[in-house]
Amino acid sequence: GLRMIGTLAKYAKYLPNGFITKLLEVRVTLLPPVARLTSLHQPQKLIEYLSRHPEPTESETTFAYYDWELQMQITRLSGNPVYALIFNDFASMFKKMAIPYFRSEMSRSASLQYYSYLSKAVAHNADTVEEVVRFAMQKSIEIWHEVRGSDASVHL
């Protein structure tokens, strides 16, 4: 089951190359429609959270915490508590990968752009929220490959 993801995070050095990419692809599938639901049910709370994004000069740890909490806010505010339960199982793996990911200025810059676009989409057009989130999640896979190298392995 999903609890396996937390266990796998403990033994990340044994995961096959490309495993993290597969997890990120799952996120591309799950998070965009959930974000759309959140923009319909609780847009103001999401906009409020997005307004507190980190500054470009803040640490990778700050970015990692903020970004993970954004994903959890999206799932919690969606109106369906099952989404939060599913994403919560990704927490340990995400935290393990997020610090090296956010060491890159490119990652932080792309994330800040995503937060801005998402805030505007939530405020003006719920239909574009899904597209904004999907694009950002796909872009994060590309950045992960650049940051971690061609094999995108998990040897963090």
Regions found by a protein language model. Give the residues of each.
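All-alpha effector-binding/dimerization core of bacterial HTH-type transcriptional repressors
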Residues: 1-69, 73, 113-135
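Long, low-complexity, charge-rich intrinsically disordered regions
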Residues: 76-79, 86-88
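Short phosphate-engaging motifs
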Residues: 30, 82-83
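Intrinsic-disorder/low-complexity, polar/charged segments
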Residues: 59, 77-80, 104
